[in-house]
Amino acid sequence: MPSHSLLVGYHGCDRSLVESVVAGKDDLKPSQNAWDWLGHGIYFWEDSCARALRWAEAEPQRRASRIKTPAVLSAVIQLGNCLNLTETEPLALVKDAHEAYLQFCAASGSPVLENRGTALQVRFLDCAVIETVHQFRQEEGNQPFDTVCGFFVEGRALYPGAGFRELDHIQVCVRSSKQIIGYFLPRST
């Protein structure tokens, strides 16, 4: 799980935030939404500037948004101790965390959260399970995960019967901002 791999991530946001972060006046804030599918942290699209811009352009239409002028911030990210959900061993951790989450809900009388939306884009259950993984690591004294990576299936099928979708992508959630080596502006967006 520890990785010295570097990747380029792209974060869709407002141009004013891009300029402020690149100038060293501000930092990206971790998302703490209950539906963040990879848990809480700073989200990036891996190697997809165009996808980050597309998200930033669509975001103001979805809800009250701070994005007035869509833009993209690029970052060099070192994965560090990564919960990589494209690998078998980390997926087993997540499966175990789901079982523990269900047991907690049963014991406490709490409702089990569900993923919602036509494409399951509101991921309450996934967020709760990923946060359970992090909680267990902390309770057991294990090294925390710095980042979480996952493959997100999104959009319409590329062609009839396709397993590929128009908006499929790899997303990275940075939990420890020290893994962000630096920010830069993409050449064009």
Question: What residue ranges belong to the model's regions?
Answer:
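Membrane topogenic helices and adjacent juxtamembrane segments
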Residues: 1-7
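Active-site and NAD+-binding cores of ADP-ribose-processing enzymes
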Residues: 7, 12, 19-23, 27, ...
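Conserved nucleotide-binding/hydrolysis micro-motifs of P-loop NTPases
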Residues: 15-16, 49
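Internal mixed beta-strand/loop scaffold within catalytic domains of large alpha/beta enzymes
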Residues: 18, 27-38
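Extended catalytic/binding region for NAD+/ADP-ribose chemistry, centered on the ART fold
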Residues: 33-59
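Short, solvent-exposed secondary-structure capping/transition elements
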Residues: 52-55, 64-65, 84-87
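Cytochrome P450 catalytic domain signature, combining two hallmark sequence patches
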Residues: 59-72
